[in-house]
From Swiss-Prot:
Superkingdom field: Eukaryota
InterPro entries: Znf_RING/FYVE/PHD
Gene3D superfamilies reported in the protein's UniProt record: Zinc/RING finger domain, C3HC4 (zinc finger) (3.30.40.10)
Protein name: Uncharacterized protein DDB_G0291640
Amino acid sequence: METIICKGCNRIYNEPLSLSCGDILCRNCLCEKCKICSQTITWAIPNKTVKSYIDSLIVKNCSNHKNQENDTNSKKSTSYCLQCESFNNLDQITSIHTYH
């Protein structure tokens, strides 16, 4: 999972950007110098590969949330619940989460 966690904020990437220094940070973590290696950032471009991978894991709601959408992601063994803001093994969600 660490490949989808921003080292600047320790959360799942929000609009991941590839930086001129070779690191990846969230758009929210972007500043003049890289928070990982301290190099000056001369350019930043969206990292579509990381974004697509994260998008493939996201479910809007786990099984204990209202308005759960019937989603193809619900069949995957690992997902990210937007409401809980955490990754979960879908087989364990029912026993781990309380109703929000």
